[in-house]
Amino acid sequence: MALISLAIDYKKSPIEVRSEFALSGLDVSMLYRSILAIDNVVHAVILSTCNRTEVYLEISDLRVVDDILVWWQGYVRNPNYKIKDYFKLRQGTEVIMHLMKLACGLESMVLGEPQILGQVKDSYTLSKKNHAIGKELDRVFQKVFATAKRVRSETRIGHCPVSVAFSAITLAKRQLDNISSKNVLIIGAGQTGELLFRHVTALAPKQIMLANRTIEKAQKITSAFRNASAHYLSELPQLIKKADIIIAAVNVLEYIVTCKYVGDKPRVFIDISIPQALDPKLGELEQNVYYCVDDINAVIEDNKDKRKYESSKAQKIIVKSLEEYLEKEKAIISNSAIKELFQKADGLVDLSLEKSLAKIRNGKDAEEIIKRFAYEIKKKVLHYPVVGMKEASKQGRSDCLVCMKRMFGLNVEK
């Protein structure tokens, strides 16, 4: 079984590309059913956030990568975007190292951001719910979560108040000096939307409107604040008229706010959704200011220096954690092989022993039977090692011959 991952992220792909290849907003159960239906795909975990879409897989044949790319391409709306031009393939240990760094926030646009760990955990949970995760992949994710927990407790990488949500609010503050007199509309009440809401409430705006598909979730977030209100997405045309700042963090497959919704009133539009929820053409109107996820980079760069030292400490923890994981996996593989070896030997002995005992019970010469039994066991036990040594010799594999000699306690110098 091989471990691989296929990824499209902000490092190689701009927002319009990431939007096309995003798997968020689609039916999760359908996604898992379809990917597990591909021959040689054994287990899978799908992660889709605003900055990346990644698929982690246990496969039985590396040639299946082409089939997975075809599967992914099938969800792309614009045929001009070809996944082979953008994806990154990782294999084996590289997958585990990347996932550890990712969960610790070291691969994020915002170095050390804590939200990614929750997103990775959510993806893992959905995979388990859809019976898509196996023992090996499960062990990988459990070690990843333990590593992230250790990094958070032993470093200060997550202590600076920096996230995509925080950076979005920073951009809004740069455009509007006095937010206390402004109305803010947040679209989406998911994890990022809730984080946006917290940052906005700290600025004490005149009014906060939170719109979501299900109003119950929005109500739960806004209920403790007198200047906050919960709304359905269907109310967006009316809400936009009132708003000075519109921030979107929602999973949609097409723009839900376009130029037809806005008049001449100056507004700040910030879209951190993938795929994009706010039409970029909003920024072409003279009175508006428009930002997308990629524009947040400038804000993030200002905060990177504060976290670089903590990042190096986190890297050391990750390297150590990976070494621990690999050692444990070696032991698991070794123990499994040893168990199988003993089971094989038991099968050989049991069959020959039963035949020998039956002959003795029938009055045959016990000494002769025991000698014959010992000879048969020796022959059966050594059959496959002898075949293997002959094959290794034919292929000039002296390393295999040395290994086999050591296994049987033979002199490796001869």
Curated annotation (Swiss-Prot):
Keyword vocabulary terms for this entry: NADP, Oxidoreductase, Porphyrin biosynthesis
Active-site feature positions: C50 (nucleophile)
One record GO biological process: protoporphyrinogen IX biosynthetic process from glutamate
Alphabetized SUPFAM superfamilies for the sequence: Glutamyl tRNA-reductase catalytic, N-terminal domain (SSF69742), Glutamyl tRNA-reductase dimerization domain (SSF69075), NAD(P)-binding Rossmann-fold domains (SSF51735)
Enzyme class (EC, first level): oxidoreductase
Keyword NADP: yes
GO molecular function per UniProt: glutamyl-tRNA reductase activity; NADP binding
Pfam families: GlutR_dimer, GlutR_N, Shikimate_DH
Catalyzed chemical reaction(s): (S)-4-amino-5-oxopentanoate + tRNA(Glu) + NADP(+) = L-glutamyl-tRNA(Glu) + NADPH + H(+)
Pathway terms, separated by semicolons: Porphyrin-containing compound metabolism; protoporphyrin-IX biosynthesis; 5-aminolevulinate from L-glutamyl-tRNA(Glu): step 1/2
Binding positions for substrate per the UniProt entry: T49, C50, N51, R52, S108, E113, P114, Q115, Q119
InterPro entries: 4pyrrol_synth_GluRdtase, 4pyrrol_synth_GluRdtase_dimer, 4pyrrol_synth_GluRdtase_N, GluRdtase_CS, GluRdtase_dimer_dom_sf, GluRdtase_N_sf, NAD(P)-bd_dom_sf, Shikm_DH/Glu-tRNA_Rdtase
Subunit structure: Homodimer.
PANTHER family per the UniProt record, alphabetical: GLUTAMYL-TRNA REDUCTASE
Additional detail: During catalysis, the active site Cys acts as a nucleophile attacking the alpha-carbonyl group of tRNA-bound glutamate with the formation of a thioester intermediate between enzyme and glutamate, and the concomitant release of tRNA(Glu). The thioester intermediate is finally reduced by direct hydride transfer from NADPH, to form the product GSA.
Function comment: Catalyzes the NADPH-dependent reduction of glutamyl-tRNA(Glu) to glutamate 1-semialdehyde (GSA).
Entry comment, domain topic: Possesses an unusual extended V-shaped dimeric structure with each monomer consisting of three distinct domains arranged along a curved 'spinal' alpha-helix. The N-terminal catalytic domain specifically recognizes the glutamate moiety of the substrate. The second domain is the NADPH-binding domain, and the third C-terminal domain is responsible for dimerization.
Family membership: Belongs to the glutamyl-tRNA reductase family.
Name by which UniProt lists this protein: Glutamyl-tRNA reductase
Protein source organism: Francisella tularensis subsp. tularensis (strain WY96-3418)
Name of the gene encoding the protein in the UniProt record: hemA
